[in-house]
Structure formats: structure tokens, C-alpha cells
Amino acid sequence: MPGAAEALPTVTVTLVAGAVPPASGALTAHCIGGFWREVGVASDQSLVLTAPKRVEGLFLTLSGSNLTVKVAYNSSGSCEIEKIVGSEIDSTGKFAFPGHREIHVLDTDYEGYAILRVSLMWRGRNFRVLKYFTRSLEDKDRLGFWKFRELTADTGLYLAARPGRCAELLKEELI
């Protein structure tokens, strides 16, 4: 359907990372906070993979049960920044954001990678996207990548991120 990709609301505005480490039982700012670079996206909805704005990186800050997400986008070669605040909901590692969006952390080691499920309702349809993030600007975390591939084996549509200037600027806190 022509123009559909432009009409799809940006799913990736609310990406977050962090789950409860098995030993601690509580989400803490030092575990979740900081820089994350988007490395992979998997969805069975092609519109999600062709969005005009592409997330390159996130900077997360946890304060109580609120999570502030600073998102760096690449929009036709220009960097855009957006901040959004979500709240932890019924289970640790699951957050709700404005616009009927939820993020659930499926797997993370906090130091290298995080795998998230983003869910949202748009035009009466449920969309689900799996996202793979690393702390590094390079693709160093192969264990996280293989876990992402295992979780998304039945999805069918993948998009691997390219290194981007916006993620670099966000990591250096220049934007």
C-alpha cells in the first residue's frame, strides 16, 4: 500500500533495555542505565522494517519506576533526538509508554546485549517487534546475536543495523 511506511507511527521511539538479573530480583540504574546501540530488528510486519526514521541508539536513565529513554534516530541522513518517559508495570523488566506501547525485556546480560519485545496497537492491529541492542558501537557480542537469532527463528523478516553517526554522537553525549 503506497505511503503506508510513512503513516506507521515510529515503533522504536520507546525502546528500552534491562531486565532483572536472576540473582538480584530488582532492576537497578547501574544495570540498565547508559548507552545501547540497535543492532537488529525482527518482525513479521514489513511496515515496521521500512519506517522512514531508523533508531541508531538509546541512552537510558532509571529513576524509581520511571525510565527515561533518549533516542537517537537517523532520518534521511540527519540525526534526531527524542526523549520519552515510561513506567514499570506488572512485572519487572516490562514498561508502558504513551501511545499504547509496551516494552518487555526478553534477555540481557547488562554488559553486552539486550533483546526486547516492543508491542503497540496501531489502526486496530497489534504489532510486535523484536530488537537486539549492544553496548558497543562495534558488533562484538556474538552470544547475544545468536540468542536473538534463536528467539526470532520463526519471524522471517530481519534488518541488521549499519554503524551510524547518530549512535556515535549519542554515546559520546554530544547530542
From Swiss-Prot:
It holds the Pfam family Lipocalin. Glycans are attached at N66, N74. Residues 1-25 form the signal peptide. One of its GO terms (biological process) is response to hormone. Keywords: Disulfide bond, Glycoprotein, Secreted, Signal, Transport. Transmembrane segments: none annotated. Disulfide bonds join C79-C166. SUPFAM superfamilies: Lipocalins (SSF50814). GO terms for molecular function: small molecule binding. It comes from the Eukaryota. GO terms for cellular component: extracellular region. It is found in: Secreted. May play a role in male fertility. May act as a retinoid carrier protein within the epididymis. Belongs to the calycin superfamily. Lipocalin family. This is Epididymal-specific lipocalin-8. The lineage of its organism: Eukaryota, Metazoa, Chordata, Craniata, Vertebrata. The gene is LCN8.
